[in-house]
């Protein structure tokens, strides 16, 4: 089931620790004693003067600390050891600009994604970065599809945005009814507790699949469960595969969940593609799947034989890319609201004022919620998912203008989380200020940098430049609409026993505790829509 999500805390069970120890032993034997340092920048970590393995093992769970240490100590760059490789971090902004927008045949983001998530083994098929086939859906087409859908939300003559809002309301009503049902009767309880992450994942899953596929697929419980299993199984499988030698990974991957779930997903999506092709353009484009089908088949003299499989695979990868990242952001927002009740009334007042000014079902409402947008962006600053950003693999040797040489195959990043705690870029960075970015809008020099979806050199959660996340606007809309519904209909609290809230670390990542819960108390009358 979708709610049966992977809990990283299972890594700490005795059985798992023993297995991890065995894996680590195999890795150490496999690589013998050490691996070389090929880039002339400082190495950060415990005992790195003598061996990199102590620091590499520590970085399995504390890589974020190493990145923060390197950011403080390094002049322009540093590197940290991991179990698989050295990772190079570029701190100098001039150097960052030199590599961030290079073509993929020189510095590839796609290659990093393929490597990090073991796509060749766990998601075999089309559209994988530097291995992208000639008939795959290009990334610019994906970006254009998402931009097309965003333009529809601003068109007052297009019903899409109203339907989008209605689906948010419907999704919440379904999940709340399920979670608040009294098992001893058919009634619902006014106060109920929910596992925050799984609740957020359910709602985000419904909204995202509406944007990608439309109805009725976004309301099909079996399909939603498959989407959840795939988005969960892919990163989990990659974490379990990564410590093993590469020659062993194909044998292990055969027994993992992600490839099997992907096959089922593609079968369902493929059948829907065939149904839509059969309409022969009689129905207008309504969602991202329609856009891709139109792109793949309309106006072409020759259609590739595997076009259906290509479109299905790209849609499956969009499910993976959107489900967990947006769910994590919504989860963090719910926890911050629950722990900081002083923000609730100002946010509710802003929602009320914007509804009165712009109407209930207009794009202008979302674009005018400056305090809410600020609260979400501050939550993102306070709880960055990844300590790094701008990840690339050098596809060929590269030399920066200052003479630093990067050999082919090197992994390059820039620090992300430490920037948000840097007083040079954020005033009072150790203090959570939910309306920080709303107040910045009064400054003509800063107001264009304040939106949640705006990227910049000191706001890298969504990337930067030509490779910035094209789905960030959809994620922003989904989180805002979710918070509007929750704030209008519920008081959100957290039990003191849950505090302080734990975060689960793995490598450079920090995630909300997936087992932590919040309590929802219904307000007097639930607002529909």
UniProtKB/Swiss-Prot annotation:
Cellular compartment(s): Membrane
Pfam families per record: p450
Pathway(s) this gene product operates in, as recorded in its UniProt entry: Secondary metabolite biosynthesis
GO CC, alphabetical: membrane
Binding positions (heme): 469
GO BP: secondary metabolic process
Entry GO MF terms: heme binding; iron ion binding; monooxygenase activity; oxidoreductase activity, acting on paired donors, with incorporation or reduction of molecular oxygen
Broad class of where this protein is predominantly found: membrane
Enzyme class: oxidoreductase
Cofactor: heme
Keyword terms, alphabetized: Heme, Iron, Membrane, Metal-binding, Monooxygenase, Oxidoreductase, Transmembrane, Transmembrane helix
Membrane-spanning segments: 11-31
Keyword Metal-binding recorded: yes
Membrane topology reported for the UniProt record: Single-pass membrane protein
Keyword Membrane applies: yes
InterPro entries tied to this protein: Cyt_P450 (IPR001128), Cyt_P450_CS (IPR017972), Cyt_P450_E_grp-I (IPR002401), Cyt_P450_sf (IPR036396)
EC number in record: 1.-.-.-
Residues in coiled coil: none
Top-level division of the source organism's lineage: Eukaryota
Primary role: Cytochrome P450 monooxygenase; part of the gene cluster that mediates the biosynthesis of paspalitrems, indole-diterpene (IDT) mycotoxins that are potent tremorgens in mammals. The geranylgeranyl diphosphate (GGPP) synthase idtG is proposed to catalyze the first step in IDT biosynthesis via catalysis of a series of iterative condensations of isopentenyl diphosphate (IPP) with dimethylallyl diphosphate (DMAPP), geranyl diphosphate (GPP), and farnesyl diphosphate (FPP), to form GGPP.
Family membership noted in the UniProt record: Belongs to the cytochrome P450 family.
Name of this chain's protein: Cytochrome P450 monooxygenase idtQ
Species annotation: Claviceps paspali
Name of the gene this protein is made from: idtQ
């Amino acid at each position: 089931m979708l709610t049966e999500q992977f809990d990283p805390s299972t890594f700490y069970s005795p059985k798992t620790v023993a297995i991890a120890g065995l894996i680590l032993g195999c890795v150490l034997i496999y690589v013998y004693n050490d691996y070389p340092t090929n880039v002339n920048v400082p190495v950060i970590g415990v005992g790195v003067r003598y061996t990199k393995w102590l620091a590499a093992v520590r970085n399995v769970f504390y890589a974020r600390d190493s990145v923060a240490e390197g950011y403080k100590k390094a002049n322009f760059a540093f590197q940290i050891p991991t179990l698989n490789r050295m990772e190079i971090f570029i701190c100098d902004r001039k150097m960052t600009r030199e590599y961030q927008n290079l073509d993929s045949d020189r510095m590839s983001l796609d290659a990093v994604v393929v490597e990090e998530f073991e796509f060749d083994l766990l998601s075999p098929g089309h559209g994988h970065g530097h291995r992208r086939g000639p008939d795959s859906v290009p990334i610019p087409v994906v970006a254009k599809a998402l931009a097309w859908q965003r333009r529809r939300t601003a068109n007052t003559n297009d019903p899409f945005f109203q339907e989008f809002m209605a689906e948010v309301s419907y999704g919440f009503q379904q999940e709340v009814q399920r979670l608040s049902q009294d098992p001893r009767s058919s009634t619902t309880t006014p106060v109920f507790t929910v596992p925050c992450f799984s609740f957020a994942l359910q709602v985000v899953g419904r909204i995202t699949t509406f944007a990608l596929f439309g109805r009725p697929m976004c309301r099909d419980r079996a399909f939603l469960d498959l989407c959840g299993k795939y988005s969960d199984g892919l990163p989990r499988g990659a974490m379990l595969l990564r410590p093993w030698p590469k020659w062993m990974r194909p044998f292990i991957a055969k027994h993992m969940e992600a490839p099997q779930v992907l096959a089922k997903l593609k079968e369902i999506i493929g059948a829907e593609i065939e149904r839509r092709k059969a309409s022969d353009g009689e129905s207008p484009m309504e969602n991202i799947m329609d856009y891709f089908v139109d792109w793949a088949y309309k106006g072409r003299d020759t259609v590739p034989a595997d076009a259906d499989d290509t479109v299905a695979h790209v849609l499956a990868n969009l499910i993976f890319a959107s489900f967990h990242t947006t769910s994590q952001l919504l989860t963090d927002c719910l926890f911050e609201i629950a722990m900081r009740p002083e923000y609730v009334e100002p946010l509710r007042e802003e929602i009320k004022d914007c509804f009165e000014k712009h109407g209930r079902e207009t794009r202008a409402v979302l674009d005018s919620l400056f305090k809410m947008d600020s609260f979400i962006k501050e939550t993102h600053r306070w709880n960055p998912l990844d300590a790094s950003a701008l990840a690339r693999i050098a596809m060929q040797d590269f030399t920066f203008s200052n003479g630093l040489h990067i050999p082919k195959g090197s992994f390059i990043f820039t620090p992300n989380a430490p920037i948000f705690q840097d007083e040079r870029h954020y005033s009072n960075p150790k203090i959570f200020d939910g309306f920080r970015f709303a107040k910045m809008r009064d400054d003509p020099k800063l107001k264009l940098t304040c939106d949640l979806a705006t990227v910049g050199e000191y706001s890298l959660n969504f990337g930067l430049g030509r490779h910035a996340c094209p789905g960030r606007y959809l994620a922003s809309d989904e989180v805002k609409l979710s918070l509007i519904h929750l704030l209008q209909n519920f008081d959100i609290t957290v039990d003191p026993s849950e505090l302080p809230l734990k975060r689960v670390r793995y490598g450079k990542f920090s995630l909300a505790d997936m087992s932590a819960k919040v309590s929802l108390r219904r307000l007097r009358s639930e607002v529909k829509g």
